[in-house]
Amino acid sequence: MDIQTFISNQASERQSILTKIHNTILENDKSVEAVIEPMMGNEMIIYKAKNSMKYGLASVKNYMSLHLLPIYGSQPLHAKYQALLPKASFQKGCINFKDEAEMPIDIVQQLICDCAPIDLVKIREDYLKAKKAKK
């Protein structure tokens, strides 16, 4: 399935915000490519950098979710956007929302711009090198 088919298969009231978030991710983080893949039992749009998931965009029964691995590892980023998006529901590495009122696209754009420079693969490689050096 391609991205447009995935979005068009969602409830009509969700299609606009899903499209806006999808485009915002691709426009503001040039390191990622989008694919449809299963995660946590559901197909979603997975945005991969260096063949590793960086973001995910899902639409499930009662809400939509923007998964952001950069905020999972950054408490300051998590706290910043939790304050900027008070109507959304924050988890460790994702933001659940029901509509654009809970997830204004201008704030999403700032969020992706803050996440874009974070190289998760390099962070992991550096961690593993440091761990190996301690042995």
Stretches with model-predicted labels:
Residues 1-135:
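Charge-dense, helix-prone N-terminal extensions
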